[in-house]
Amino acid sequence: TLKNIKTACQAAEGLVKTKKIIKEYKPDIVIGCGGYVSGPAVYSAANLKIPTLIHEQNAFPGLTNKILSKAVDTICISFKGSEKYFKTKKKIVFTGNPVRENILEVSYEEARKKLNITKPCVLAFGGSLGAKKINDVMLGYVKNADESIHIIWGTGKRYYDEITESLKGIALPKNIEILPYIYDMDAAMSASDIVVSRAGAITLSEICAKGKAAVLIPSPYVANNHQEYNARALEKGGAAIIMTEGDITPDKLKTTINGLVNDKAKLENMKQCALKMSTADATSLIYEEIKKLTER
């Protein structure tokens, strides 16, 4: 079709342009993190015999990284099990996803003291913009939530007014905090026991790094349904419970959360499983792979 011809022409043009840029700047290494934009740059570098590395954040690799895997020197993966999607196994190194140092520096006890939390804590959010399905379910849940559980709910700025309007006239107890945006996510994540969220790669890496039990609602609106694969990896590791958009209701969420809070052994086991899946030193591991390639 005409569209396919146009795409092929754009890809060829991208290769020519990136090859020219790489020849001009002479980089020591070219790194790709997926996405079609990285394709021409990494492929051109590989053709010019410049060291190349790709980092796959998700459990299910994107198309660009799968194509590039044949040409690059090193493939860094973030989830154990992802190697089965690549044909060139000898290039694969398990590094995990880097997480922010700040989030690692705040302890559970310090964060709870800072936020004045004394009860089991649930942190719920759908990313910086919010997620409608998570908000719809949380809206029903907080109306009947147990007062023995502290709840921090980040709605996202675009949903906040609508949600506060829906709760008008309802006297929510002090244990429920509803915020348009969680500015101190380091403290909120550190102080929590259970996290209710989507299943983006970095979010899950932070959940594991902090050792939190997770109730995951993967977004069905992402490429290759990669959030479902990410969530399944944590579920398989014993760190998460998955509730799909088609299945979750406020009552089911309440039952799941109460079940974890009331079963301290299960909750603690999920936290420990999350910690076991963590690669808090991912940045160092990736750096070492870069160093190997640039020093060879």
PLM features per residue range, with description:
Residues 27-48:
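An aromatic- and histidine-rich active-site surface loop
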Residues 266-280:
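A short, well-ordered alpha-helix in the C-terminal region of glycosyltransferases
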Residues 46-109:
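Active-site-proximal region of nucleotide-activated glycan assembly enzymes
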Residues 108-195, 227-232, 236, 243-252:
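Donor-nucleotide binding loops and adjacent catalytic segments primarily
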Residues 1-29:
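An amphipathic, basic-hydrophobic alpha-helix
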Residues 279-296:
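C-terminal alpha-helical cap of glycosyltransferases
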Residues 197, 213-224:
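Short hydrophobic beta-strand element within catalytic cores of glycosyltransferases
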Residues 27-29, 190-205, 212-213:
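Acidic donor-binding loop of glycosyltransferase active sites
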